[in-house]
């Protein structure tokens, strides 16, 4: 009698597997049970392709430093520093000292600062079509004695402020005062070493503005604002009195505490300049956390404020044109830094002078006498009808007969060396005119 083979006992969870018994085949219920995956076999809906990006992407990092200005003992509370005017335009002259300021970065301003060697690009955007901004970082060094505030406003506007016809965005200048920026979000208080000792630099992130989301054509986005910053000097020790005022200014009531002048201190551009002889305790020359000027009794040194930045960009696109590789065999891998004489010569002569071959109508060496008057032969050569000289032919082989052509020196000698003319009549005419 045929005896069936004994069924092998399962050595794993028999009772557990009985709950999830496969009823419709082995592959129909895969992914269910104790080893179930979340939506493993669910089909995703098909989407329509709306845009296609190029795979040719390049990252460009811009590293540099930006001057904010110098703090001098003679600067008033309303003095504005504009060192950026020296780089944004060729004819601009910026003021490098003041107690506050603000400006912005555009891609064009970064290129202008690269020409002045204030920053450097990690790569070039030649043969690319589109660009996008990925944010960056600003680094600040701790001052020795003075303190200042710094803020970044990434939501100012899209285009460059200097190129807009309206002046509505200039209203932000009226709010850059320490008493108002103290309670505004995004304002960083950078204290001196006398207040707080730090080993590393202050690091401030530069977010991507809302208007910079996505890719933009490179020629169109040169004037878009990347980030807008503002800064101001402030004194945490002399907050509610003017230390530069004469008399007992600490005991006097501030001029901006009355009912009529509660908001008059906000616009620092409307403050008065302190007189030379000294200010009184109730003069409108100072504001909360902002004395009339950096008093020499508190500060023994002037200060320079600046920051270091690192901005990140990406370029993409398939351009039909490609740049020519640089030939390193002529100038080497690292060129020589420009000297002062080279920079001045380039500024004085922007267009190079072209040297043309001399002709018989030119005043040649030896044509003038001791009194600076033309000789007879030179005068006759210049005033007579001279045919237009032919274009000098370079040294080489003519393609039609294979004979070597004349050099440039031979053609010039043939055009200049001609037989000396006779000028007896002109000499007599000159003698008659001299006698008259």
From Swiss-Prot:
Q: Specify the superkingdom.
A: Viruses
Q: Where is the composition biased (Polar residues)?
A: 330-344
Checking InterPro entries in the record gives: TTvirus_Unk
Keywords on record? Capsid protein, T=1 icosahedral capsid protein, Virion
A GO CC annotation given for this chain: T=1 icosahedral viral capsid
Positions of the UniProt region annotated as Disordered: 326-370
**Main location per UniProt?**
virion
Q: Where in the cell is it found?
A: Virion
Q: What does this protein do?
A: Self-assembles to form an icosahedral capsid with a T=1 symmetry, about 30 nm in diameter, and consisting of 60 capsid proteins. The capsid encapsulates the genomic DNA. Capsid protein is involved in attachment and entry into the host cell.
Q: Indicate the family of this protein.
A: Belongs to the anelloviridae capsid protein family.
Q: What is this protein called?
A: Capsid protein
